[in-house]
A protein has these predicted regions:
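C-terminal segment of classical bacterial N-terminal signal peptides
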Residues: 15-23
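Soluble extracellular-acting proteins and domains
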Residues: 25-136
Length: 136
């Protein structure tokens, strides 16, 4: 009887140890919050050029909405692809001199890229939790 109790206690302790990291794992709502924060930065970042408010900002916001939508659908790898597309657009705009790069004037293009990297990492974590493998 004592061996069964000891085995059960050890098994329970081991199960709690293995399950503990899952309690601290990234959640969809946490990633949505990160996306909302990125969206807020895109709404206020200084964008120069004649298409800033008619094409550039709406395009970036549309990409962010796409990330959010695929996340809600549980398509984590599709969301990562959309984050990478967003980053490409931001890099193109930085290269063209369209995005603010002075942190004293508000969000910068580099800040958008860093936030997008954090979102992609969190999405990969969700993919691992869901499927056991990362997105590529």
């Amino acid at each position: 009887m004592m061996k069964k109790i000891s085995f059960a206690a050890i098994f329970f302790a081991l199960a709690m140890f293995v399950a503990a990291p899952l309690a601290q794992a990234t959640t969809v709502s946490e990633v949505q919050s990160m996306i909302t924060q990125l969206r807020g930065k895109v709404q206020i970042i200084q964008i120069s050029g004649k298409n800033a408010e008619t094409k550039d900002r709406p395009g970036l916001l549309g990409q962010i909405d796409g990330i959010s939508l695929t996340l809600d659908q549980g398509k984590f790898c599709n969301s990562v692809t959309k984050v990478r597309d967003f980053q490409k657009k931001v890099n193109d705009m930085i290269s063209a001199g369209k995005l603010n790069q002075d942190p004293t004037l508000g969000p910068t293009g580099q800040e958008l890229l860093a936030d997008a990297d954090a979102i992609a990492a969190a999405l990969n974590e969700l993919a691992v939790q869901s499927t056991g493998s990362q997105c590529f």
